[in-house]
Each structure stands twice: as structure tokens, then as C-alpha cells.
């Protein structure tokens, strides 16, 4: 079986636009690999493809759960592999598109063979998080395994899970080995020169705030309180707290745009680090990635 193409790039780089163009040209079906577009109602702040775009190119793994639910990497991997198998069974070509490192790694490397959850230990770690803060817990991880600290991407839920396993077993989730992946993948990664990517992030942030992001954040707050501990998964999405503050009148839109842009730039740097260190791929320019994908989809790679 030929490898499944996988397209990744940092946030705001334009991977969805490239996927749509290729999807229309080659009749592809997109398998989304994003931790927050899985949630119904998180549309503007996640830059989710619009209904019109999805009518042109079928997308899978969008709008699959309510914002009140948790959605983890194991659940994603099972759903994504099922969607890929379905697309292939119908004689079509799936294209995995996304920037969530944990999801991409789970597809490419396989799911970690991690012990089941320990509710009592998790509660202890969550209490630690509330009392000491995320930086203290990340420092504990880094002292034992610096690479693991980078891999966790400052995600509180992942940090809690990592320490839950580590304090019980002396090993982190990624140290238990992996279940073999269901498919082989051919990775295509791209980025822009950093000043250009920064400008794209800033412009997109302002556009999303003007398009109704504050109202979307206010709706989310009605569904899931943002101040719960541990922090709800949906409120880990970039920018929603700032957008909510704009709606509440406690933060002006320009200040919110600056804060969101800064956080998004930091996230983009982590994404690029992940691609290089965890996926072992060096990003190329957008045009180089597009040319390579066209060559692959035209038959060179699909016949491998």
C-alpha cells in the first residue's frame, strides 16, 4: 500500500488553503489533525474550514464532539485511522492536514503503550498544578527528561498525564514503546520566513477578532466555565480567553490582538520544533511543498 500523504505547517502558514487547492485538483478527502477543530462551535477562533469549503472538499474529524467533552490523542488516532481506511476503501486519496504535534506523532509513530489512568494519582497531580502552577510541574518533567518537557508543549492536560504516569512508574508515556501505526505516511512540511509568518499571524488574529471571535468565546463560556480546575480542554485553545475579555469589555481589541499574536507566535515556534525533532522532517518553502505534493499525487508517490 502506498504511503498516506501528510501535510503540516505552523499555525497561520496556509496549510488549509493548500489542502483545499490540492483537494479540488486531485479529488482528495482531508483528514484533519487539529486538537480544537474537533469541537462543534469552535469555528472562528480555530480557523476551521467553512461549510462552503467543506462542500468542495470533504473533511473528516471536524465537529465531532461537543465542547463539554474531552478528546484525547487515543480517541483521535482511532477515529483518524478509521477515516483513512474508509477513504481508501472507496478508492479515493486521504490527505492528513494539521499542526497538532501529538496527533501527528500518534499517527506516524503509533500510540504509546502507556498504562491506564490512575484517578487517585491524577487527582494528586491536578492538585499540584493548582497549587504550584504549570511551570513548576514542567520543571519536574524537565529535570527527569528534558525532551519530554518539550514534547508536552506546555499543555496542562498532557503535563498532568505525563506526571501521573511518571510518579507511579518512573517512566513517561513515550518511554513504554508504541503500538505499530496502521499506515505508512509521506510527510510534507512547510513554513514561511519568520517575519512573514509573524505578519500572517497578526493579520489573521485581527481578522478573526473582527469576524466575531469575542461572541464565539462568550458562547463557549456559557457552555463550559473557563475558570474550572483543571482547565477544561476547550479553554486551552489559543486566544479564547482574550477574546472573552474583549466581549466582557475588560480588554480592548487591539491589546487582545497583541496578546493573541504573541502567544500564537510562540506556539508556531513550538510546532516547528516538534516537526524537526519529533517527526524528523525539515520544513521547506510553501511552493516547494506544493510542488512535491503535486508530484506525489500525480502518481510518483502513490505508486510506491
From Swiss-Prot:
Catalytic activity: adenosine(37) in tRNA + dimethylallyl diphosphate = N(6)-dimethylallyladenosine(37) in tRNA + diphosphate
Keywords recorded for this protein, A-Z: ATP-binding, Magnesium, Nucleotide-binding, Transferase, tRNA processing
EC number(s) recorded for this UniProt protein: 2.5.1.75
Site (Interaction with substrate tRNA): residue numbering on this chain: 100, 122
Residues binding substrate, per UniProt: 11-16
Matching InterPro entries: Dimethylallyltransferase, IPT, P-loop_NTPase
Highest taxon listed in the record's lineage: Bacteria
GTP-binding in keyword set: no
Annotated ATP binding sites: 9-16
Subunit structure: Monomer.
Purpose: Catalyzes the transfer of a dimethylallyl group onto the adenine at position 37 in tRNAs that read codons beginning with uridine, leading to the formation of N6-(dimethylallyl)adenosine (i(6)A).
Name the record gives this protein: tRNA dimethylallyltransferase
Species this chain originates from: Deinococcus geothermalis (strain DSM 11300 / CIP 105573 / AG-3a)
Gene: miaA
